[in-house]
Design a protein with these regions (language model features):
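N-terminal signal peptide c-region/cleavage motif recognized by signal peptidases
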Residues: 13-15, 19
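Bacterial N-terminal signal peptides that target proteins for export
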Residues: 1-9
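Ser/Thr-rich, Pro/Gly/Ala-heavy low-complexity intrinsically disordered linkers and tails
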Residues: 521-525
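Extracytoplasmic/lumenal domain signature
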Residues: 20-518
Length: 526
């Protein structure tokens, strides 16, 4: 009898293993956009779109050159060459409302450019130079006037003033911008990641712009450049950028932290804090999620850096406290969450804690996900704890960091999966991996990325993009990698996948809102 049970268990294990193997990602193409070598791919999440209306999706990706790739093969169709890197995700929209898509990017030469998506020729009025001598690290699109026309919002690394600018589709600078101007109330500094979110958190009928910067304050801006009022809890007449964010809300209310002795004052730095927008508790009101780099203010940043932690904020800058979930006190950091490396680029490139919101367990409430400099991917529930096997610690010898995740119900079974790429130390000869984990953080798949072409190591630092490529009914994941260009994998058994957070910053507007949450009935994404 025991032998029979053992045999049945063995068969069950084999069946489970076989099912897992059948779902292993399959490499479709690699080295997209490369020539005799591959340019370095940074944090720019690619796009999967049909640029010419022929019913077949292309891939648009950026390293230094911006490239348009055949979706089926990865062959280069168009190239806009440059020696200036692209950091923000590839933004795509019909800017001119002429039926033709535009692609909008920011570069480290201080320029932003809108291109015709099918030809990669600059649109009339572009490029613009919002931040001469500085890098465009953040770029998002938003319908600021609620009339169907998208404006382009950009953020730069300059620290003294004028960190955020807004442009019309024709490249004209919008009246009232840039901000902050010299003499404006509040505090802001440089923007060092894709740190712009756009949404109507205050129910005005028009979206607002929210931008964390290289301080412990968040800019809250109206479409005309004026600043958004903060809750009277923080004092009369204050705006968002005058209310500092701290670990303890009592310091927010008092207006400062006690930095006189080690351990007394803890607050976040938001230089790399790309925020997300969503209705976290399902009550019809939007909240903003931002993940901060918490540090001891006695020691300063980065010397006093402790860990990444999330904040949930309302439209008036107060902390989320609704539906039985009190976020006036934020989660307590878990053991082992200290930074493994920051700013030591000869060792490893930095992790970016882009915020992601998605309902992992199907209860109608959104969970909070981000990748951290502790070598883990975190997922918090609204009860301020990490469930199951979360956080997911990246396996391997030495240091490894993870890209911001994408989220989807891949197999249309009600179970949600989390997809991300990793990268190793720059001193290694490794490649990173493409990971798929389940909603409780258990690993389902791990596949090596392609060998490097032009460097000693390879990995994926940009958020994956999910979509349908020509030639298959299955969902694909496209990665922008460090040294193998754009790479595409087919995800078997996924023709009816439901995407929840399918690309960097949530969607091709790159403004912190989820692109979609619907089932593609024919598996083709149209």
């Amino acid at each position: 009898m025991y032998a029979r049970i053992a045999t049945l268990l063995s068969l069950l294990a084999f069946a489970c293993s076989a099912a897992a193997d059948l779902r292993t990602p399959v490499l479709r193409w690699q080295y997209g956009g490369c020539t005799s070598f591959c340019q370095t791919g940074w944090y720019s999440s690619p796009a999967i779109v049909d640029v010419d209306g022929d019913g077949k999706a292309e891939v648009i990706a950026g390293s230094y050159d911006l490239v348009l790739l055949d979706g089926a093969t990865g062959a280069t169709k168009q190239r806009a060459a440059s020696s200036a890197r692209i950091w923000p995700g590839i933004a795509v929209a019909d800017l001119n409302r002429d039926g033709h898509l535009s692609v909008v990017i920011g570069r480290n030469n201080g320029m932003a450019t809108a291109f015709d998506a099918a030809t990669l020729t600059p649109r009339a009025g572009w490029p613009v130079t919002p931040f001469p001598g500085y890098e465009v690290r953040a770029l998002a699109l938003g319908d600021l006037d609620a009339n169907g026309t998208y404006q382009i919002v950009v953020g730069g690394t300059q620290s003294s003033s004028r960190q955020v600018n807004v442009y019309a589709p024709n490249g004209a600078q919008r009246a009232g911008w840039p901000r902050l101007q010299s003499g404006d109330a509040g505090y802001a500094a440089g923007i060092y990641n894709d740190d712009i979110a756009i949404a109507d958190l205050n129910h005005t009928g028009f979206p607002q712009i929210f931008v964390p910067t290289d301080v412990h304050y968040v800019l809250g801006l109206n479409r005309d450049g004026s600043q958004i009022a903060a809750n009277a809890l923080f004092g009369t007449g204050k705006v968002w950028s005058q209310v500092g964010v701290h670990v303890n809300q009592s310091d927010d209310i008092r207006g400062y932290a006690d930095c006189s002795a080690t351990g007394h004052g803890q607050r976040p730095n938001f230089a790399a804090s790309a925020p997300a927008i969503g209705d976290v508790d399902g009550n019809g009101t939007l909240e903003m999620l931002v993940v901060g780099n918490v540090y001891d203010c006695t020691l300063g940043n980065p010397a006093g850096d402790l860990h990444h932690l999330p904040w949930l904020l309302n439209g008036d800058r107060s902390r989320f406290d609704a539906s039985g979930y009190d976020w006036t006190a934020i989660p307590v950091a878990s053991a082992g969450s200290a930074p493994l490396s920051e700013g030591n680029y000869t060792l490893i490139e930095d992790a970016q804690p882009d915020a992601v919101l998605a309902d992992l367990d199907g209860d109608g409430k959104k969970e909070i996900l981000y990748s951290s400099y502790d070598g883990k991917v975190h997922a918090y529930w609204l009860d301020k704890t990490e469930h199951g096997a979360w956080p997911f610690a990246i396996p391997g010898v030495g240091l490894h960091f993870a890209s911001p995740p994408a989220v989807a119900d891949l197999y249309h079974d009600g179970n949600v999966e989390v997809i991300f790429a990793t990268w190793p130390q720059a001193t290694s000869i490794e490649t990173g991996k493409l990971y798929i984990v389940d909603h409780l953080g258990a690993m389902l798949q791990a596949v090596d990325l392609p060998a490097p072409k032009g460097d000693t190591w390879n990995g994926g630092m940009a958020a994956p993009t999910l979509g349908w490529l020509p030639g298959s009914r299955n969902l694909a994941v496209v990665l922008m990698t460090w040294s193998s260009g754009a790479v595409a994998y087919e995800l078997p058994q996924t023709p009816y996948a439901r995407t929840l957070w399918p690309t960097g910053r949530g969607g091709y507007l790159r403004n912190g809102n989820a692109f979609n949450d619907r089932i593609f009935a024919d598996g083709l994404g149209d």
